[in-house]
């Protein structure tokens, strides 16, 4: 069986734009990770109706967007259910600059939280660790970069925040998400 790879940010961005969808790669991936971490069934069709409703007024996506969305979904499932429990984030890379990366992270986190809501997260049964992780993510979603501050310090702080987002998301996924998938270890990082 072939290895599953995450499509490149620019490839996803182009496919979404060419399809006329007003969703960024970070938003798409954040929604998918949120839905998966919230307990969405792991088959390749479960995400589609929710995504269509959220991003396209309930209308289906063009085939090219479905293909790219499915590739992102399959990679994400493989990562989150694999033995290494990893999380790659589909946000702009280092070459895109700190402001773009920070905006992408904010989009990703906001849509992760929305993805949890789409699968009807029940907070009354959530552990304290999950509640704390969600509060942290809500605060992180509102953070911004101050262009007047030392850019190197801002870069360092961004990396710390990015790592904390990983911890929060994995904490939530471990509590609510589906367990090991038999082909999950095929993801390439």
Curated annotation (Swiss-Prot):
Family as reported in the entry's similarity comment: Belongs to the UPF0149 family.
Highest rank taxon of the organism: Bacteria
InterPro entries on file: YgfB-like, YgfB-like_sf
UniProt cross-references to Pfam families, sorted A to Z: UPF0149 (PF03695)
Organism: Aliivibrio salmonicida (strain LFI1238) (Vibrio salmonicida (strain LFI1238))
A GO CC term attached to the entry: cytosol
NCBIfam families membership: PRK01736.1
Protein name in UniProt: UPF0149 protein VSAL_I2539
